[in-house]
Amino acid sequence: MSDIIPVFLGADLNCYNFARAFHEAYGVESYAYGRYPMAPTKYSKIIHFTTVPDMDNEDTMLRILHEFAAQHKGKQLYLFGCTDDYAAMIIRRKAELTEYIAPGPAADLYGSIQKKAEFYEVCEKFGIPYPDSKILTAPVDAAELTEDKLGFAYPIIVKPSSSVDYWKHPFDTMKKVYTAATPAEAAEIVKTIYASGYPDRMVLQKMVPGGDDHMRVLTAFSDENGKVRAMCLGHTMVEEHTPHGLGNHAAIVSEDTTSLPLVENIRKMLEACRYTGFSNFDIKYSGIPGDYRVFEINLRQGRSNYYVTATGMNIARLVVEKWNDGGTDCVLNKNEVFWHHVPAQVAFTYTEDKDLVARAKALKAQGKEACSLLYKPDLLWNPVRYACVLEQLRRQFKKFKTYYPVHK
């Protein structure tokens, strides 16, 4: 398998998790390109990162990738985007990247489901519950956002329908997701986002009760024929709470995937759409038995994808061995593993569900635990990387103390 060469666009934890999976499975090193280096991949021996300041320009991307392919003729090249923007670029220009195997949905399908508003329309067809929502196409007065007009009570969630377009229009108070306590606050958030130049729809949504530990994450892999070949459910312990990182998983306990009532409907939806590649769903349990609400679909592997690999379902092997093997089997993970990218003690301290903490501690005691950055082959005889990783982990204590005070 030495002919395998993974290539990533991005340098974040998503990139490191996937590169680690390839290294574990096949002993190969990965290549990555991005606009700037990032801590999760700095000084790594398993990733060769190159800074390209305008890597978000599609013509630059094509030039770099064609040059790389020309230098590695005869190799089995795999290409993945590690952010929404990079994934979208690859999907749009996939027809011009024939040197690579680039698992991902067709461009027309991408256009129809990557935005939350459109995705909810698809969910309707397949009986997949999502939070009650109001869609806006422009700023409105607070009088139009009363509870009577919305059909649900405050506080509410406010977020852009298109994450890709949203992050292209930065402003000082920018957040990944917003909470509004009053109609006036909701109207002001919407006004500010549209004033930045954001061109798409806005989603105002009923708040689903419960903390981070009510969240679930579902990862699916579909082969080139649109058959779902693997699914893995994770129970979120705690998420990041920095303004730009809000909602990113910090610790997950993987669970029996068959325990999620929505799994079969989601599989049917993916296959009916002939979806290909990785998909990642954010889901929340409302506290009512059996009531789970899907928030969104990410049309790529998730940032926390190592929670899947840690169960034994190595995501690199899924791509290499199931993408075009002609099979139809679908493996649903049932193994429990405690995954985290923050120190375990941070996860234990800030997870409010103490029964879930007890499960995670038991898994840790059994050796069923994985921390993305603590990869021995990348740390051995690599003191600078080791120091960098320790510093990243150390800083998590301050981040959580600042942005997520312990609930007493």
Placement of each model-derived feature along the sequence:
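ATP-binding N-terminal substructure of ATP-dependent carboxylate-amine bond-forming enzymes
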Residues: 1-105, 140-145, 389, 399-406
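Short glycine-enriched loops at secondary-structure junctions
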Residues: 34-39, 84-86, 224-227, 234-237, ...
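Active-site nucleotide/adenylate-binding loops and adjacent lid/helix of ATP-dependent enzymes
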Residues: 112-203, 224-225
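ATP-dependent carboxylate/phosphate-activation module, predominantly the ATP-grasp catalytic core
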Residues: 175, 181-184, 206-274, 298-323
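A short glycine-rich, hydrophobically flanked beta-strand micro-motif that places a catalytic Asp/Glu
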Residues: 205-206, 276-288
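A short beta-strand motif that forms the metal-chelation/ATP-contact edge
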Residues: 290-300
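Peripheral (often C-terminal) accessory segments that flank ATP-dependent C-N-forming ligase machineries
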Residues: 321-408
